A protein has these predicted regions:
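Topogenic membrane-insertion module of multi-pass membrane proteins
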Residues: 1-46
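Alpha-helical adaptor scaffolds
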Residues: 226-236, 246-309
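Hydrophobic transmembrane alpha-helical segments that form the core helix bundle
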Residues: 107-198
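Small-residue-rich helix-interface/hinge motifs
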Residues: 45-108
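Polar-ligand-bearing catalytic/cofactor-coordination segments
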Residues: 67, 104-110, 165-233, 237-240, ...
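Alpha-helical repeat scaffolds
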Residues: 203-215, 238-250, 274-289, 312-326, ...
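Terminal, low-structured helical/coil segments at or just beyond the last alpha-helical repeat
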Residues: 321-355
Length: 355
């Protein structure tokens, strides 16, 4: 899909989102509220509608997953996760990646089942259903401004999620439609995500990698290549890891995969004491939101960067503190946790010895 088309769709989606707020203000204005209170209540109503719609979007995935044999692992919005473990539900908190506002994770025993596309389509189907319900509500009540809020809002969210780029539902559906063989990588990714939430201490990252065919393309295939590179890194095979991530950067156009590969190359540069290379990667504008995430593996790398490159001891200690605090909330598998605990200990030793 051309860049102009993508930008056009995003522009239309943003305009629709703005229009939904305008409809909210007008709707409350017609109820007799002053301009100030119409603005306050209208914007609050649309904001809450967005949050509710995101929850319903994920419930759509969960419902379609249930219909096709998926077992619910977690359902979340923002930093909050509802996790199902041993038949019981409990709440958890996690860090949030850029552009990921909500998530559903489910696992399936029969991994040869191609109906994963139906599960991935659940959120989009919810938006279509909500638009139809809003239209029906408008005809029945003649309160079209309130109906328009949900029509326009869901149309905006449908467009952004259906667009086949990045890590959207549309991109994943298109990938599996075009390359059905990638379903194996998709199921492996789901099992990895589920394991990090349910029992991270029982498995290593290397348990969730598999060979990727030379011509494989798409997020799921590239994610598997990333995990293989991270296994090389954890095992100290820096040459192999560097080659893997450089190769990924050369072939991918997925912004998330690019960011992870670049952060991994920053990690390797720090291990190799290549200060200029590390500073070059850290200065990439698109990486800054990722490098600020309060996750153990990122903050450990941030601590080493502040120590080796910036020589800022205050920020080094702050990053170390965050890395330790977030150790359990970062959902690291057994070998990952051991690696970052050791890397943190090495940094603390260097600080104590004044090296």
């Amino acid at each position: 899909m051309g860049k102009k088309v993508i930008n056009l769709v995003y522009t239309i989606a943003i305009i629709f989102l703005i229009l939904s707020f305008a409809c909210g203000i007008i709707a409350f204005g017609e109820l007799g509220y002053s301009l100030f209170w119409a603005f306050v209540f209208g914007c609050a109503f649309v904001y809450l509608s967005i949050k509710l719609t995101l929850i319903l979007h994920e419930l759509g995935h969960a419902f379609c997953g249930y219909l096709t044999g998926y077992r619910l692992v977690s359902l979340g919005i923002g930093r909050f996760l509802l996790v199902k473990k041993s038949g019981k539900f409990y709440f958890s908190r996690t860090a949030v990646f850029k552009n990921v506002s909500a998530q559903y994770i489910g696992i399936k025993e029969d991994e040869s089942d191609q109906r994963i596309i139906l599960m991935l389509s659940g959120g989009l189907l919810v938006h279509l259903c909500l638009m139809l319900l809003a239209i029906l509500f408008g005809f029945l009540t003649q309160t079209w401004y309130f109906a328009a809020i949900w029509i326009i809002l869901n149309l905006s969210l449908f467009l952004t999620n259906a667009l086949p780029i990045g890590i959207t539902d549309g991109a994943k559906i298109w990938e599996l439609w075009q390359s059905p063989e990638n379903v194996n990588y998709a199921y492996m990714s789901l099992r990895h995500s589920a394991q990090t939430i349910l029992a991270p201490e029982e498995c290593d990252l290397k348990d969730f990698v598999m060979p990727v065919s030379e011509n494989a393309q798409g997020f799921f295939a590239e994610n598997m290549l990333v995990q293989q590179g991270q296994v090389f890194l954890l095992e100290g095979k820096l040459k192999e890891a560097k080659q893997q991530f450089q190769s990924i950067l050369e072939q991918t156009d997925n912004s998330l995969i690019q960011a992870i590969a670049q952060m991994s190359l920053l990690h390797i540069a720090l291990l190799e004491d290549k200060v200029e290379t590390a500073e070059e990667y850290a200065s990439i504008l698109k990486l800054k939101p990722f490098l600020s995430l309060k996750m153990t593996h990122i903050q450990t790398m941030q601590a080493w960067y502040q120590y080796k490159v910036k020589k800022d001891l205050a920020k080094t200690h702050k990053a170390i503190q965050i890395a330790k605090e977030k150790m359990n909330a970062s959902y690291l598998l057994r070998d990952e946790k051991r690696y970052y605990e050791n890397w943190l200990a090495k940094l603390e030793k260097a600080l104590s010895e004044g090296i």
